[in-house]
Amino acid sequence: MIDADLIVAGAGPAGLATALYAARAGLRTLVLDARPSPIDKACGEGLMPGAVRALRELGVHPQGQAIRGIRYTDGQNVVDAAFRHGPGLGVRRTTLQSVLLDRAKDAGVELVSSRAQDVRPDGDGVSVDGRRARYLAVADGLHSPIRRKLGLNLATDTTAAPRWGTRQHFAVAPWTDLVEVHWASRSEAYVTPVGPDLVGVAVLSSVQAPFAQQLEAFPALSKRLPLSGASSVRGAGPLLQQTSTRVAGRVLLVGDAAGYVDALTGEGIAVSLACARALVDCVAADNPRAYERRWLAASRRYRTITSSLLWARRQPILAPRIVSIAARLPRVFDAAVQQLAH
């Protein structure tokens, strides 16, 4: 007996967007997640203009702060690039997940408070803890347990230091309508306006240290922030996660579970939305094999730009000059930002 056309494992943004696209395609859809909502995690919380447009097409309109563009600064050099095709949006992760969840319920998606554990794919479908579907979309996060159980993990490069992300909010009015990226010797701090009196600060680094200690690398930023945060510190990592394939029979990976390079470019939600749409197209066409090609195409720009910037970040000669080079070549910086914003 078939319980659904598609079971989605994970009720984060990638999983819920997949469920919404599936419902729109007329597929019976079931979402499994045992975590209580709203689900929070370490996240830069900045939506690129392309992500804002994709969410609107799904009928999802989260409240947040308009973002006009991106600023890079290293304390001496500053370079800005404004989005050309509409604003981005700074929005709390919990707000985004809650709005997506409500929209999924309205669309007729069945939501079950249960963690997908016993996954058994076969030639005709997938059984998940006794529930049966034609396909399974795996959206259970960066360190996907299902991906690991199915043997789809690839070993990462051990010669490069792993990178980690941490995030905390501060009760202070945003001082700009740009996402500010502050560069230090071994880390970056992303400041995103997420409310009229609230900013989120996400630090990416190859150094593991308490959040307050991480902020010491950014003295100009630290002067603007209250001594105490307005939320608890959330962390994630190692960020680099590689997979052998996004398709294993009738099991398809989406979101961070499908593989992740780094959060340097802040494009995660936009890529997840594009890949969720591609996944549903392939499921609706009963052609899961096409998803690997569609995923590679949808994520190519993100993977190329992020990998290139990460490579530069790891070069002792280039790393201290990234912002100064961007400031001397503002048209190149602007072009890169427009590519990410698309």
Please tell me what each predicted stretch does:
Residues 52-101:
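A conserved beta-strand/loop capping segment in the N-terminal third of enzymes
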Residues 103-227:
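Predominantly flavin-linked oxidoreductase catalytic cores and closely associated redox partners
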Residues 7, 20-43:
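Glycine-rich FAD pyrophosphate-binding loop
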Residues 35-58:
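Conserved N-terminal glycine-rich FAD pyrophosphate-binding loop of Rossmann-like flavoproteins
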Residues 281-342:
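C-terminal helical "tail/cap" subdomain of flavin- and related membrane-associated enzymes
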Residues 1-14:
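Beta1/beta-strand and adjacent pyrophosphate-binding region of the FAD-binding site
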Residues 118, 161, 207-280:
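FAD/FMN-dependent oxidoreductases across multiple families
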